[in-house]
C-alpha cells in the first residue's frame, strides 16, 4: 500500500478543485438523493417542498424526543413507510418520478431521514422508460445511457462483460471486478463471478450504478463499483400482463407478469422464454427465466422480502474472429484457421463448428431479507440466500461444474446525533461460502461435442467473512463528512488431479490453501446547501482476491503446482464531482476520477504452452464522466452520457518469448478512450404515442500491451416508435403497449467486443482470436397486454 499512499498529493489537488468548484457554484449543491426525472416543477413548488421537508423533519425530531421520555409501555407502535429500505449492501432505488422526499402521508416516526444511500458517491440510475419502451434483447442500451459504464458482448445472448472506470476491462466473458445485486440480493458468487443471463429487460424498472472502488461498502471484488437491478413491483403490474415480440434473425420472445399489491403484501412474478437463430453463425439459443418476489409487511415494525430466480440457458457459442476473418465475413462461426482433426482431441483447436461450442447452464437463487425497526432511529436488516450454478460448457475442452453458494449479511443503521450534529451510522457483518466441484474432459471435435478422456477433476471451497462500519456526520449545515472501513478474511482451498491426455492415466496433483486479509478504507466530503446542487470529493479503495485456477500453476515453471506468491489486486479511487440542476428542466452530472491499480492479476506464458498467474505491479486510469438530462417541454427528453478514460502502465515488465519488456507508459489494453451515448425522446401523452432516436459512439483503443493493434471505432444509430393504449371500459383489457424498433439503422459493420491479446507487431496480433461482430440492421416489434 505504500505506493498508493505516495499518491496522496492527488487528494490535496482534488480538495483544491472542490473549493474552486464550490466557489463557481455560488453556494448551491445538489441533494444526495438520485435526481428526479421531472425537472418541470416550478421554483415555487420546489421551495414549498423544501419547506415541507424541513417542517416534517423538525416535527419528527420533536416527536422522537417526546416519545423517548415515555415509558416503553406507553409508546405507540412505530409505523414504517411503504418505501423500500435499502442498506449499503443493497444500494437503494433511485426515484425516477417527481416524488417529494417527504409527503403528507409520511407522518410516521420512521421517515426517509433514514439512510437511503451513502453520501459522497457517484451514483446514476436509469429511468423506467429506458426499459419500458424497448423490452427487447439485452440491458446494454439502457445501461450505457449512464456515464462511466461499458458493456461488451461475451459468450451468450445476455452474457456481457462490464467495465467501470477501466476496471473489468480485461474480462472476456461474464462480469468480474464489479459487484452485482438485484433487489438487494447479491448476484455475485463468492469467487467474484457474475453473469447477466438472469436479467431480463422486461422484468426491470431501473438499474443503478455506483462508480468507483467500493469495497468498504460491498467487500470483495468491488474494484469498479456496484450495479443494482430493480425489478417491477406488484403495484406496477396490478394484474396480469402478457408480452410478445419478434424480429430479425429469428428472434422471438414470450413473457408473462402477474402482480398485485394489498395492505400487507406486494407480489410480483415474471416468466419469459426467448429464442433466436442469431446474427453470427453458430450463436442460436433459447433461454427461460422465472423471477418471483414477495414483500410482506408483517406489522408496523417488521418487513420481509422473499425472492426466487431461476434461469435455464442453452446457447451455441461462436469463436472470436481474427482481423482478416472479421473483414471478410463478420458473421462466420470462427476458428476455422486453427489446427483441428475431427474425432481427435487438440487443445489448440478453436473451430466452433467441429467443437460444437456451447453453454448449457442453469442457475437458481433463493433468498430473503428481514427488516426490523428496533426503535425510532435504528433499523436491523438480515439477508440470507442460497445460490447454485450448474454448468456444462463445450469449448476446446468440456467443463462440468457445480457451484453451490451460501451468502448472508446483517447490518444496523442508526440516525442519531453527535452533540448537536446529525450523525448517520452503519455497522454490518457478512459471511459467505462457495464450493466448486468440477470435471474437465477432452472435446473430440467431431461436430457433436463428444467427451473424450478425463483431463482433470477438482474440488474447491472459498470462505469469506468480514465486517464494516460507516459514519456520516453533518459537521456544519449542508457539509457532510463520511468515513468507512471494511475488513474481510478469505480462505481458499483447491485440489486438482490431472490426467495424461493420451493414456488417461494419473499425471500429477496440484493444490493450494491460501488465506487473504484485506482492509478497505473510504472517506468523502459532500457539500449540498440546496436541493439543486451537490459537490463531493471521495477517496475509496477496492480489492479482489485470486480465483481458484490462479493458484494451481507454479509461477516459476508454469507447471501444475501451488502459486504461493500471488497477491490480491487492489486499487485506490480518487474522484471529484458535481450534480447540478442548472435550470428546472436541465440536470447535469460531472465527475473526474483518478484510479491507481496495484498488483493486477494477469496470465503470462512462462515457457512453451505453460502459463501462470502473476501480479502486474501498477497502472493508472484517469478520466471524466458527464451526464445531462434536459426536458425543455412536456414529453420531450434529451439525454446524453459521455466517458473519457486515459490509462497507462506505471510499472510493469511483460514476459514474452523475447524476454521481459518494460511496458511503462503504454496504454492498458482493452480500455476504451471515448464512449458517447445520446438520446432524443418525445412522448405525446394525449395520444399515447412516443418515439426516440439513439446514437452510440465508441472511439478506437489498443488491444495489446505493445499498443500496435487497435479496436475499430464505430457509430451506431437506433430508432423506436411506441404506442400506449388505455382501455377504460373493459373488465378484461386494461391497456396495450406496442413498439417497433430498428437497431443499427445504417447497417454499419462493427465489432461489438474485442479482447486483450498478445503479439508485439500488428501482424502478430491480427492473427489472434479478437472480435465478436455486432448485429447488422435488425427490426423488432412487440406488444404488452394488460389484462384483468
Task: Name the predicted role of every residue range.
Residues 418-434, 459-597, 681:
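Structural signature of Gram-negative outer-membrane beta-barrels, strongest in the C-terminal barrel
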Residues 81, 88-93, 99-140, 159-163, ...:
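N-terminal periplasmic "start-of-domain" segments of outer-membrane beta-barrel proteins
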Residues 32, 543, 686, 697-702, ...:
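C-terminal beta-signal and adjacent terminal beta-strands/loops
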Residues 185-211:
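Short acidic/polar hinge/loop motifs at secondary-structure boundaries
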Residues 82, 95, 481, 489, ...:
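Gram-negative outer-membrane beta-barrel transporters
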Residues 260, 265, 379-385, 391, ...:
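Membrane-embedded beta-barrel scaffold of Gram-negative outer-membrane proteins
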Residues 112, 140-185:
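Extracytoplasmic beta-strand/coil segments of soluble accessory domains associated
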Residues 239, 246-275, 280-319, 357-373, ...:
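Transmembrane beta-barrel wall of Gram-negative outer-membrane proteins
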Amino acid at each position: 500500500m505504500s505506493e498508493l499512499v505516495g499518491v496522496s498529493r492527488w487528494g490535496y489537488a482534488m480538495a483544491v478543485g472542490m473549493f474552486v468548484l464550490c466557489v463557481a457554484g455560488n453556494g448551491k449543491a445538489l441533494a444526495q438523493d438520485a435526481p428526479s426525472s421531472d425537472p418541470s416543477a416550478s421554483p415555487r413548488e420546489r421551495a414549498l417542498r423544501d419547506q415541507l421537508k424541513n417542517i416534517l423533519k423538525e416535527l419528527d425530531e420533536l416527536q422522537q424526543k417526546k416519545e423517548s421520555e415515555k415509558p416503553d409501555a406507553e409508546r405507540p407502535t412505530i409505523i414504517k413507510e411503504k418505501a423500500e429500505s435499502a442498506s449499503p449492501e443493497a444500494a437503494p432505488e433511485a426515484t425516477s418520478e417527481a416524488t417529494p422526499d417527504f409527503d403528507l402521508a409520511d407522518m410516521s416516526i420512521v421517515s426517509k431521514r433514514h439512510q437511503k444511500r451513502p453520501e459522497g458517491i457517484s451514483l446514476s440510475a436509469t429511468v423506467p422508460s429506458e426499459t419500458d419502451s424497448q423490452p427487447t434483447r439485452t440491458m446494454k442500451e439502457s445501461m450505457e445511457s449512464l456515464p462511466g459504464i461499458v458493456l461488451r458482448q461475451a459468450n451468450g445472448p445476455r452474457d456481457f462483460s462490464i467495465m467501470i472506470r477501466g476496471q473489468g476491462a480485461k474480462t472476456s466473458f461474464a462480469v468480474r471486478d464489479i459487484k452485482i445485486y438485484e433487489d438487494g440480493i447479491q448476484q455475485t458468487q463468492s469467487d467474484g463471478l457474475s453473469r447477466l443471463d438472469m436479467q431480463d429487460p422486461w422484468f426491470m424498472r431501473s438499474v443503478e450504478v455506483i462508480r468507483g472502488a467500493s469495497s468498504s461498502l460491498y467487500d470483495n471484488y468491488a474494484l469498479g463499483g456496484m450495479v443494482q437491478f430493480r425489478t417491477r413491483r406488484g403495484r406496477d403490474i396490478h394484474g396480469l400482463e402478457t408480452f410478445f415480440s419478434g424480429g430479425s434473425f429469428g428472434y422471438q420472445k414470450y413473457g408473462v407478469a402477474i402482480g398485485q399489491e394489498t395492505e400487507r403484501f406486494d407480489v410480483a412474478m415474471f416468466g419469459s422464454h426467448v429464442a433466436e437463430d442469431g446474427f453470427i453463425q453458430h450463436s442460436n439459443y433459447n433461454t427461460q427465466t422465472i423471477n418471483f418476489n414477495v414483500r410482506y409487511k408483517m406489522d408496523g415494525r417488521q418487513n420481509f422480502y422473499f425472492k426466487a430466480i431461476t434461469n435455464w440457458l442453452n446457447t451455441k457459442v461462436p469463436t472470436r474472429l481474427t482481423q482478416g476473418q472479421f473483414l471478410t465475413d463478420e458473421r462466420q462461426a470462427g476458428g476455422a484457421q486453427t489446427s483441428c482433426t475431427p474425432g481427435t482431441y487438440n487443445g489448440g483447436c478453436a473451430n466452433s463448428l467441429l467443437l460444437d461450442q456451447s453453454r448449457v447452464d442453469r442457475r437458481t437463487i433463493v433468498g430473503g431479507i428481514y427488516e426490523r425497526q428496533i426503535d425510532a432511529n435504528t433499523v436491523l436488516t438480515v439477508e440470507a440466500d442460497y445460490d447454485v450454478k450448474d454448468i456444462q460448457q463445450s469449448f476446446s475442452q468440456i467443463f462440468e461444474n457445480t457451484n453451490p453458494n451460501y451468502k448472508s449479511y446483517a447490518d444496523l443503521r442508526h440516525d442519531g446525533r453527535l452533540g448537536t450534529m446529525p450523525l448517520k451510522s452503519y455497522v454490518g457483518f457478512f459471511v459467505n461460502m462457495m464450493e466448486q466441484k468440477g470435471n474437465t474432459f477432452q472435446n473430440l471435435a467431431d461436430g457433436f461435442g463428444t467427451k473424450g478422456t478425463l483431463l482433470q477433476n477438482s474440488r474447491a471451497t472459498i470462505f469469506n467473512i468480514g465486517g464494516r462500519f460507516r459514519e456520516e456526520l453533518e459537521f456544519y449545515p449542508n457539509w457532510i463528512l463520511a468515513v468507512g472501513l471494511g475488513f474481510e478474511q478469505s480462505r481458499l482451498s483447491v485440489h486438482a488431479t490431472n490426467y495424461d491426455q493420451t493414456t488417461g492415466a494419473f499425471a500429477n496433483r496440484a493444490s493450494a490453501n491460501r488465506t487473504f486479509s484485506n482492509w478497505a478504507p473510504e472517506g468523502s466530503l459532500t457539500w449540498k446547501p440546496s436541493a439543486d446542487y451537490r459537490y463531493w470529493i471521495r477517496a475509496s479503495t477496492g480489492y479482489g482476491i485470486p480465483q481458484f485456477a490462479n493458484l494451481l500453476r507454479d509461477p516459476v515453471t508454469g507447471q501444475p503446482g501451488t502459486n504461493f506468491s500471488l497477491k490480491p489486486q487492489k486499487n485506490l479511487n480518487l474522484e471529484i464531482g458535481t450534480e447540478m440542476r442548472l435550470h428546472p428542466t436541465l440536470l447535469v452530472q460531472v465527475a473526474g476520477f483518478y484510479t491507481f491499480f496495484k498488483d493486477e492479476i494477469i496470465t503470462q506464458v512462462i515457457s512453451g504452452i505453460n502459463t501462470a498467474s502473476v501480479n502486474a505491479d501498477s497502472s493508472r486510469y484517469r478520466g471524466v464522466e458527464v451526464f445531462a438530462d434536459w426536458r425543455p417541454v412536456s414529453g420531450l427528453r434529451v439525454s446524453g452520457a459521455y466517458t473519457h478514460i486515459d490509462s497507462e502502465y506505471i510499472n510493469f515488465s511483460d514476459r514474452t518469448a523475447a524476454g521481459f519488456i518494460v511496458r511503462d507508459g503504454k496504454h492498458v489494453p482493452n480500455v476504451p478512450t471515448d464512449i458517447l451515448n445520446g438520446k432524443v425522446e418525445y412522448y405525446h401523452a394525449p395520444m399515447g404515442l412516443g418515439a426516440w432516436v439513439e446514437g452510440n459512439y465508441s472511439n478506437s483503443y489498443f488491444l495489446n500491451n505493445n499498443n500496435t493493434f487497435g479496436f475499430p471505432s464505430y457509430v451506431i444509430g437506433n430508432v423506436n416508435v411506441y404506442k400506449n393504449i388505455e382501455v377504460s371500459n373493459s373488465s378484461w383489457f386494461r391497456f396495450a403497449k406496442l413498439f417497433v424498433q430498428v437497431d443499427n439503422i445504417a447497417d454499419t459493420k462493427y465489432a461489438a467486443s474485442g479482447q486483450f491479446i498478445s503479439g508485439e507487431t500488428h501482424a502478430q496480433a491480427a492473427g489472434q482470436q479478437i472480435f465478436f461482430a455486432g448485429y447488422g440492421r435488425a427490426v423488432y416489434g412487440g406488444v404488452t397486454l394488460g389484462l384483468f
